[in-house]
């Protein structure tokens, strides 16, 4: 079935390794798709062979034989990869087939071919041609292609046999050839002459655009050009500029759809405007060329867009300009990442276009202007794109896969920014090969000289505008204003707290104020630091810098230096009697003059003048926007000083209202933060500090280097350091608090969570139809426009029942039912639930009331009956009770009305009809007079009800034999009514109907004269329509459902979706336009090699616990499994397995519950279904609307053939508005290697015919063609769709399902040069259409009900949202659907949920810093395709490629909004290792962002408050996380210093030192961050908002019980480690996290490898610090808060060491522990080497683990060594604590002696190591004796020391604590200096030492886990904690089953 091993196959390694070799060939040759890439031309022949095989095997054989011959011609030497195997397999098959087919042959091969060709032409092609309407053009296109191949084979066979081809056949072939030129596969628009009858080509807007494009009047065609039919402007551009044919076809369709969609919005009634509207052209042109015109203006060049003076030619010229841009863009490949490079190319080509059209003469040649790169085939690709592409590829190669420093190669941004300078025009046109853009590095030049290559250019240009240098200083440099603010605030607060009263009001005292003013000296120093940093970090871009930028750097540095001198000088003179530093300065400059504070203040005012100006501009953003865009020299000079002139980052400022909102947010936050810091941290710390500084300490426990130092500065630093770190970090906590409150309020105002439960939905259901129609149905013109805004949203009320009832009810019913039936298709609800939820499809004109879904009316009739029966004649009371429950009233009214209609329909007889009419009219009279209960006896109603139910049941079965029974039932009913209910009124009534003939007969009447009541009945009902069936079924439900439907639907996901959708209809959203007038859009999904569809083998494959994915899913989704069995009509799983045809359904069911491509495609194709239904509701006439969409769907097969039918029009509109492209990068490789995934992708294309797949096709050029040897590879960007299913000629059964290529555009080389995914998106973006582009990941999902809101969402692109510009990215809300899998998945989904809701809500409004975070956002497609695409692709720096799209959009004056009335599903990682990998990837990405130019520019170009928002919501979060961990380190190392030096003992009598409140406050803040407080706050607020605060509280408690704090503390370590390592050393890489279900146990060795450096090493270091502190720290045992602080750090240690085992499924199961230990031992002792993967050997893993140091540069290595020195502190401090040396003076020789001991031990270890290598083989006994002797000596010394009291057991423990860290520190330094150590020959010893440490760490971690595994209840507890209960139960069952199976099999063997 499936060839994949398990659910998660390994991704293909490299490109094509041995994929197409013998392993998967042989019989697989039947598959025409498994063809080596160099033989791709023979695939169509093999396809035809498969197609004709059923009808004529001999012809199929001849086709295959011809294919073999052609393959031999293409590659005679079989040099291509896999060609020899392919030919051999094909030949083997031909030998077999020749014998079998010869037997059945009646004529010669030539005759056989000829007769078959004639038969095919007449029977098949002519039949299709003669078919009415030629509607099935797809089959016709396919037939022409097949006929062309058959003729090719026929010709070859005839040549072989020397037979002439008959004239008749030649004639037929000529016709076929003509037609196959016209009938080519198309994407959306068939543009051939025969396509006029296609529905989409009938639209006036399409016709208008096509005819405008075909206006080629006056275009100068080259001489000798052959005219083609229907030639258009793009053909002319192709001829003149040499674009590729498929590129032209692709962009032709693109341009037509774009213009047609914009045109129709200008003219809602298309008939009004037969010509293409100029306004539409102007709109598209403005969007397309906005960036180009801005570029021209920036560089001071005139744009090349010259329009003619003759009005008639303007439209043609505009179309040519647009066509040219799109053709350049469509073929630009990787150049699309360089938008200004495209502007440069376009600038010159548009100028040439203008020259040709204006008939200009070239001054150089004297001839008419011609394009510089002529019009031959592929000229544009070869001569324009390829040279630039090669430069990109060369630079990418220099990056060495991201290992090189960023400063050593130019990334996409550098290459693009070359075109931001006027110098780019030096490149020339035609481009000069020796231009500096193309030039090489010094090394390359040297190589070229040595090889005597021609010179191509001088030195390498270097980086442009910015250098990404790996340094922490980027954090300060990018956000210098924020750091300056914090440093100056800290200084001011310390000064205020230190001086005077220490109160804030003290600032107004003269001296204090003057001291506070010293902050300006600090400000000047910080300015100088920034200026120096700017120069240092930009040094490597100096070659590309313009002179005025260099000048600015120098001026800035000089000015800052002057201020640094001037400020302290004037400050010193402002004091009468200065002290300290001020006094020194004053003495230097002769300080006898009088003081002058006012002079210092004047200097400050001058210093602040630029800031005052910027503050003024900050208050008036519109002035700032104008100035930044201005070209006036004076303005440019002024702006030049404040910030360098740059093409992007200008005019980003928001409106005054937005500015006010985010400024208020930050003002409140900063006041709170600074007040807390002052009162809780700084002020209380001043007094203890003063006290400590006064105390003199003379006794030290160690050798003190500065015994006479004053003020105890070491103690002061140890005290203040953690507090200051927390001061810089705690803004993140305040941000979490304030953003949670603001986000909660914002959400409440947006009406989130108004409908949270089913009960709330029921109570609001009556206003739902009106809300539906208000939001999802376009407004008619006559209606008043809706009010907008928050207040309007709150005051908006919906009528209980709509006024124009019929149509609105019908529309509501169609959409509501579509949603409910999608629930059923997804198996969220059962058949019964679906019946209860559906609203009648067919409108019943006879019922004058709205019919609610039965789940609202269920059990209402039986209850109403009881109430009526017990009412005792009190009418009013019953009415009152009915009026309280409106649904009951509806149910009663509907039942009565339906009963009336039904009886009137059934009874045909005249007299019975009169009686019935009379009864009904009497009842109606009673109802009107409200005397029903008083006058009638309703106690008999139950009898009537019973008879009515029986009648309905007979009607449902509708059998002829039941007619007599129905008569009896009707008579019974008549009797109940006349005798029991209307007893009093019967005689008069019957008399009136019998005209007084109501007499008693005494005589027997003959039979034929007897009157039989109800003899004439309309039964059985022969014209049983769907509407009739539905009506009867509904009536039966209303009457018989006795239990309440309160829990319908019972599935939690269905409830969540229904309530969210209903709630969203009451939120504010734009009005829905008609489908015809909506904005068109595409969805783009990048896919690499993840699961497409689970295979049966993958589903049933069991893990070690006997749990398969299928079993797991059945337990997780039990109700959905039951619903699935019901849907496929199976009673049990066994029955399902027995039916082979349901295997596919089972695979689909499982795949829809995983993170698979199938799930994503189904979700996104809901957009199309929604659009089709909405198009129907827009276009249907009243009669069709009342019949319903279902009726239309039932006739869809026939209707789609006719271009005029409503169904065809709906389909065509959906095509025009929506495209879905999946970019399957590896599809061709997978297809050629017979990979199951390729088949599954093809199956998706067949299921969804409008789905398109784009892929990169890699074709090997064969030796014969190649001019550079056999390895030449050609790359194409291709788009395919499913071909019509090929049917056998003699039967209608389909033979094969294939794809067909629509476009195939050649690329200049391999597309993947950077991060991979961005380039995968980029190559396929040319196949997308429309004005919006939604980027969707392959682990996302969509829902039918959400798809209905898409047209509303797209309208947001036309609204300014209170800002100054319309949105360029629409952010969408996500729902994380993987939360039910395990407790970890639940934490992760809650965390992610809060980010994608409340987090992004606050980012978008009020903060205005939402960017693009992964994928459900909708991009303004035209905006982004002209500005570099939807992500950035440079290797490593753009690791988080998505967020850079948001940065880019914002910097280019875009606007990102967030909308919460629509949601998309999203899968997340579910196991600890997967989650940690994801977190590591994000932390790595943030590390790279810190170095990036985008963040630097945002930090400098935003105003102060928006810059703060940007920092704290991007890298600030990660830096604060790192500071949190750093605080713990600094605190503990500070304590270590105090304890070991003896200072703590000396200060222990200081009360203030003991109860240190500020330290407690600081570390409490740190603990908040540590345990996930930052995550929990917004999470709780969002859950409270959407599900109620009591649920939030329950969830919070449950999360704590499931150890959420452990999880968040653990993730803290992950973020810190990977963010820090990326900043220090680089090594960031994409980490594939997998999308599987984690139901497996991770081995101990795997956990060790993954967490060793990030958690375990750090955890052990902290543990040693804590242990030392516990042993020697005395002072604070009693203080409660202090214990809490210590507990929180111990909690961190334990979490970092043991969380991976705690969250590991079956982590405490004894058998697993034993297996893990064996596996770990094997791994740790395995030798490494070349080709040994890290998973197999510790040595390989260790080498890889320290690999990052190789590329980290000198700075990184020095930093690593400096950080390693901290481990030597332990030894220095602890040696002096040994009991032997306590009495001695604290001499340095003691420390020296300890080093002697360490070196002695190391020498012995080294000696033993050498001995092992030299002697262990030949002198094994001798070596053993030596080893024994060494051991005994060591043991003897130890015993002697203990006996002589020279050492105590405590000393031994201390020695271990001292020497372990020292060894580790030496190891770290040795690793950093690896090249040096290797040269010295000590590397093997270092490796041995490292292995020893790893073994020790492994033991330390393994022992407690193994100990706990002894107790079975620990494992039980863990399973309960880790998985929800259903699965825990399942796990046990599965183990038992596994056991039983084993028992059975063993018995069978016996």
From Swiss-Prot:
Residue intervals annotated with topology Extracellular: 503-505, 574-598, 677-713, 1533-1560, 1613-1655, 1704-1755, 1809-1827, 1873-1894
Regions that span the bilayer: 482-502, 506-526, 553-573, 599-619, 656-676, 714-734, 1512-1532, 1561-1581, 1592-1612, 1656-1676, 1683-1703, 1756-1776, 1788-1808, 1828-1848, 1852-1872, 1895-1915
Name of protein: Callose synthase 2
PANTHER family, A to Z: CALLOSE SYNTHASE 2-RELATED (PTHR12741:SF70), LYST-INTERACTING PROTEIN LIP5 DOPAMINE RESPONSIVE PROTEIN DRG-1 (PTHR12741)
EC number of this enzyme: 2.4.1.34
Sequence ranges on the Cytoplasmic membrane side: 1-481, 527-552, 620-655, 735-1511, 1582-1591, 1677-1682, 1777-1787, 1849-1851, 1916-1950
Role, per record: Involved in callose synthesis at the forming cell plate during cytokinesis. During plant growth and development, callose is found as a transitory component of the cell plate in dividing cells, is a major component of pollen mother cell walls and pollen tubes, and is found as a structural component of plasmodesmatal canals.
Membrane-topology descriptor: Multi-pass membrane protein
Protein origin, superkingdom: Eukaryota
Subcellular location: Cell membrane
Gene that encodes the chain: CALS2
InterPro entries documented for this protein: FKS1-like_dom1, Glyco_trans_48_dom, Vta1/CALS_N, Vta1/CALS_N_sf
Reactions that this protein is recorded to catalyse: [(1->3)-beta-D-glucosyl](n) + UDP-alpha-D-glucose = [(1->3)-beta-D-glucosyl](n+1) + UDP + H(+)
Major localization listed first in the record, in broad terms: membrane
